Amino acid sequence: MSGTSSMGLPPGPRLSGSVQAVLMLRHGLRFLTACQRRYGSVFTLHVAGFGHMVYLSDPAAIKTVFAGNPSVFHAGEANSMLAGLLGDSSLLLIDDDVHRDRRRLMSPPFHRDAVARQAGPIAEIAAANIAGWPMAKAFAVAPKMSEITLEVILRTVIGASDPVRLAALRKVMPRLLNVGPWATLALANPSLLNNRLWSRLRRRIEEADALLYAEIADRRADPDLAARTDTLAMLVRAADEDGRTMTERELRDQLITLLVAGHDTTATGLSWALERLTRHPVTLAKAVQAADASAAGDPAGDEYLDAVAKETLRIRPVVYDVGRVLTEAVEVAGYRLPAGVMVVPAIGLVHASAQLYPDPERFDPDRMVGATLSPTTWLPFGGGNRRCLGATFAMVEMRVVLREILRRVELSTTTTSGERPKLKHVIMVPHRGARIRVRATRDVSATSQATAQGAGCPAARGGGPSRAVGSQ
């Protein structure tokens, strides 16, 4: 132990666990910001149902967690509140060697080349949805983003193609994934699902399971399994060093996990991007130009759209923290923390740091163009061995969907106040659903041709020099 280490927990508010739980549920990032202002970059909360939680906003301390021994820093244990939905073999809930081996087995569908093959289907899904948007009328775009991201998962991840089953999945999955606090209680305590008070939730899970097991059975029986590119097909084919493949239950758990981890999270990121762009006319104009360039095959267009996505996820993180439960005493941020404590890298606090991001409240995608991002200072997907498996997929999906929106419709800008982040389950959503207005449709063929003739992209003209952003 270092001679500068302190025994015990860092300081924190002395409020009761139930009061702190209410503050976290209702005020989330505002409460954490107030604690950081009073106690510094490391502080302790005692939240009912979670015990002691040590929050970290210093990148050096976060590096200790992300680079630490996975057998000491348990992320699966920290995610146990989702056990009733995800299942015991979910990648989010397992730890140690079991997690390492399962993640290795599941990685191929999320490699860059495999993800790139899904860009075309994602664009088609987005274009079909955009074609039905209302004109000259304000509407909440968040539900539209959820429709797009759900369809992307159903068709590219699950690989569903049967019209009847697809229709059933479109109906059942949103009902299952959009549960309230009462249902969340049963998901954290699976034994409650047998209680009649939660019978409706149990039936929703059973309906979803029946559809997913049917897809798994179809994939196993498909004579063209080897040629399929959907994620489920690749998971069915995957085998470990001993030739063992995943069981039906294991496959089911991973599909539900991918739905939970990749549906509302990406939809919310896209919603925030549109909420931010429509309040920044100059940036919106540059993004439209980048979308046209991207559609014409100009890599600079992709780069600027990626910068929009990265800056959105910085300034409006969808998830504002990630947790690890300590299995033994360990030194973090100058404190010798005991086993059982949850250490929590505070994504939202890091992303709002003026030391790391000058003028952090300014939405400025240019700061991300050509930037080298540190894994402990830009961390919307978590970090270390538990970094989101689908991070590359999510970034490609955000880029492609933004491109299709901006090249197909003209969005009105607004001077109304920005929407407030509101906690929905474990994600931060725009409190009014990210309301936008479509002024007109755009001639896709004309814009693509103009770009191909040399209109170019703002990123290609030096949106910013290559530099390190948020690095230590």
UniProtKB/Swiss-Prot annotation:
Keywords: Heme, Iron, Metal-binding, Monooxygenase, Oxidoreductase
InterPro entries: Cyt_P450 (IPR001128), Cyt_P450_CS (IPR017972), Cyt_P450_E_grp-I (IPR002401), Cyt_P450_sf (IPR036396), Cytochrome_P450_monoxygenase (IPR050121)
Catalytic EC class: oxidoreductase
Gene Ontology MF term list: heme binding; iron ion binding; monooxygenase activity; oxidoreductase activity; oxidoreductase activity, acting on paired donors, with incorporation or reduction of molecular oxygen
Cofactor(s) annotated in UniProt: heme
EC number(s) given by UniProt: 1.14.-.-
Superkingdom as given in the UniProt entry: Bacteria
GO cellular component, as recorded: cytosol
Family matches, as Pfam families: p450
SUPFAM superfamilies xref list: Cytochrome P450 (SSF48264)
Sequence positions that bind heme: C388
Database matches in Gene3D superfamilies: Cytochrome P450
Low complexity composition bias: residue spans: 452-472
Ranges for region Disordered: 442-472
PANTHER family named among the record's database cross-references: CYTOCHROME P450, CYTOCHROME P450 12A4, MITOCHONDRIAL-RELATED
Family to which the UniProt record says this protein belongs: Belongs to the cytochrome P450 family.
Protein name: Putative cytochrome P450 135B1
